Curated annotation (Swiss-Prot):
Keywords: Copper, Disulfide bond, Ion channel impairing toxin, Potassium channel impairing toxin, Protease inhibitor, Secreted, Serine protease inhibitor, Toxin, Voltage-gated potassium channel impairing toxin. Expressed by the venom gland. Pfam families: Kunitz_BPTI. The record marks 17-18 as: Reactive bond for trypsin. Disulfide bonds join 7-57, 16-40, 32-53. The keyword Disulfide bond applies. This is Kunitz-type serine protease inhibitor dendrotoxin E. It comes from Dendroaspis polylepis polylepis (Black mamba).
Length: 59
């Protein structure tokens, strides 16, 4: 399985101040982890559930 490049991006909460639980793929740790999304901007390495993260980046 070839990893999608967005799976290598760091967690990006963005500039807004909400605290929305989300998951990102931690490339160094090789697993999906929780972070808090601010609600705007950010990047493609953000998923609403750990299952979606695993499906996209773990395979």
């Amino acid at each position: 399985l070839q990893h999608r490049t967005f799976c290598k991006l760091p967690a990006e909460p963005g500039p807004c101040k909400a605290s929305i639980p989300a998951f990102y793929y931690n490339w160094a740790a090789k697993k999906c982890q929780l972070f808090h999304y601010g609600g705007c901007k950010g990047n493609a390495n953000r998923f609403s559930t750990i299952e979606k993260c695993r499906h996209a980046c773990v395979g």
